[in-house]
Amino acid sequence: MDTQVEMLLDSILVACPQKIFIKKVKQIKKKYSFRNKDTMQSIRELCSLLYIVDQEELALQVASLIDKLEYKGDMLIWMNVYGVITVESLIYAKRGEDEKVKTCRKTIEDVYLYYGDEAEQRLSMKIFKRVMNGEGFYLDRIEQDKESKDLKAEIFHHLLQFEELIYIRAMGGSEAYPIEKLDPMIEEEKQFIAKHIDKALF
């Protein structure tokens, strides 16, 4: 890990002293490798969490650690790359930087929809349509967490729900979930997680 990355991670702890940020930074420092899916997942989650607590510049800096990584055929690794790209897209959309929003979308599409042979592309398109229709939502899990009064699990599932929503937004929205419907839903998830950030631990 080079000094710049270490300085970035240390600056996050100054801006965000909550336990969840300490944990994510520790996880990233422990094994700083882009081939390690746990590290990549921690980078993605850290990026989302920074956006949620209104640290957009830090979120962009964390995203830039992995947003240029090429797809090498391992979707478990690359889903974390497109995860940070969706956060970038959200920030650029807020700032009215439409060209950057388009670039984010194209980067995801090139891998997610157009990688592999025809059969693979057909399957990807099928999955993509289901995701865009909200079939990957975590609303049932969130309800279960509420019933069992498991706040930690509920916060985590709200984060996953947030990430589903910002993915749909980054890809231009859909008939079921146009951008004007997505934005208040994203804001609701953001507010919930921000409110309970001290209790977040995953």
Please give the residue ranges for each predicted region:
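TPR/TPR-like (Sel1-like) alpha-helical repeat modules
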Residues: 101-114, 190
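Helix-turn-helix repeat elements of alpha-solenoid scaffolds
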Residues: 13-26, 52-65, 100-106, 134-138
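Eukaryotic alpha-helical solenoid repeat scaffolds
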Residues: 127, 131-202
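Flexible helix-coil transition and linker loops at the boundaries of alpha-helical arrays
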Residues: 29-37, 69-78, 114-120, 147-152
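"A position-specific structural signal for the A-helix of alpha-solenoid helical repeats
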Residues: 6-10, 45-48, 80-87, 121-129, ...
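N-terminal leader/linker segments that initiate helical-solenoid repeat arrays
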Residues: 1-19
